[in-house]
Amino acid sequence: MPIPQYLAMTAAEMEGSAVLPHQMAWMACHFSSSGNGLSNLPKWLPTGSALILDDSTPIHDHDPERIAAELGQCIQHLQCVGLLLDFQRPDEGQAREVAEYLCETLPIPVIVSDAYAEGLDCGVFISPVPPDEAMASRLTRWQGREIWLDTTMEGLEIILTEDGAKSTPLPPWERPEGGLEDKHLHCHYHISLDENSAVFTLWRTAEDVAAQLAEAEALGVTAAVGLYQEFGSPLPGAEEG
């Protein structure tokens, strides 16, 4: 059975959606900027949802025990299936301390960003695999761990000149139509040539991401996460529980 893809939603997206995705993740929770503890914990979620905690507000001197207590109460009340720590400040030492404490304390799977996960007894949240990279190469070092994969249809533009290669992200709304398909990298691509350069444009469609997740399942990935504003609905063939 295909692995589930949790669609991450903000509070505003939840309020404005007439029908919620079958599998969703709350992405509005962060460390309080005005005191010790957390801000924007959800009061309600569909049973079986995931909870995402980010460090958009730096941790500073937040108490790990208080954070664990607040999360534990929320998780138990809402029957969440997992906590995703989307931490993006690898130089912040206290972030790792908090992550380690939550992994040891909370009663549900805790999934930690790959920048922090080395040496922790927890699941790993793999950052998006760009369309010019084979997925297996990204996952090899994490074999044997529970793995959640960040998914996106963001593309990549690679410009080759005599000075070398330059890569820039390509937002999903700028991806071209048509193109050729690469079944190994699960992407589409287009090549433009002129006298001085070659431009490789690579992007993923919803069908490409669905194929990517099929390979991810074969490689041991447990679940995926994607932005609701990007995917809008589960991918073709995604598990619905």
Where is each model-derived feature located?
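An acidic- and aromatic-residue-enriched active-site/binding cleft used to recognize and process polar
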Residues: 115, 154, 229
